[in-house]
Amino acid sequence: MDKENLISLEKILGFNFNNPSILLSAITHPSYAFEHPEEGIEHNERLEFLGDAVLELFISDYLFRTFPQKSEGDLTKLRSRLVCAESLYELAFKINLDKFLRLGKGEFKAGGNQRMSNLANAVEAVIGAVYFDCGIEAAFSFITRLYGEKLKPENLEQLPKDEKTTLQELLQKEKNNVLRYEILLEEGPPHQKIFTAGVIINDKLIATGRGKSKKEAEQEAAKKALELLKNEKEV
């Protein structure tokens, strides 16, 4: 990526990075880093890890202050809707990450710049980059602008639920259900891993799902579990 493109992204984000290579790393998919080791740019998984934590802190703090009467369970549900892959995927297009994401040739040809997991992960990586380079206040300011109208209390109540949240709420209607997710399998090279996740209810494996990230695999597994439970009720 040339310097002009990186400056264009900085303008969209509203920040001049002290170390532009941090931003470059945030938009570098593992497949690209694997194909171009000569650039010496780290891929975005570590920044994604950092950004995930920063985003969760911001959303938790915001919801805690905005809804003083809501229970821990209700706050958790709202947070899940705000930070789920579907929500981050939508936000990625707001800052044109689909145009800036650096992908390996195979991943790009496979439509990787439109793939939910790639874009959702890149959003978290960008948040991590802003935090690491500019500090917590800058990161919180960026998240506020990124989410925009989504953070208005009246809009928060209308947020769509992801599959994991829907499954959790369904099981909570019946007492004593214990829900957990487990990564059952990791396949492929480091830059193109495929994960298989399992939905386990009361220590019983109910459904599995596959995806290019752990989150994506868990969402797919939850979706299949919901379909299975729905079919059982219709019988």
Curated annotation (Swiss-Prot):
Its EC number is 3.1.26.3. PROSITE patterns: DS_RBD (PS50137), RNASE_3_1 (PS00517), RNASE_3_2 (PS50142). Mg(2+) binds at residues 48, 121, 124. One of its GO terms (cellular component) is cytoplasm. InterPro entries: dsRBD_dom, RNase_III, RNase_III_dom, RNase_III_sf. Its cofactor is Mg(2+). Belongs to the ribonuclease III family. Homodimer. This is Ribonuclease 3. It comes from Carboxydothermus hydrogenoformans (strain ATCC BAA-161 / DSM 6008 / Z-2901). The lineage of its organism: Bacteria, Bacillati, Bacillota, Clostridia, Thermoanaerobacterales. The gene is rnc.
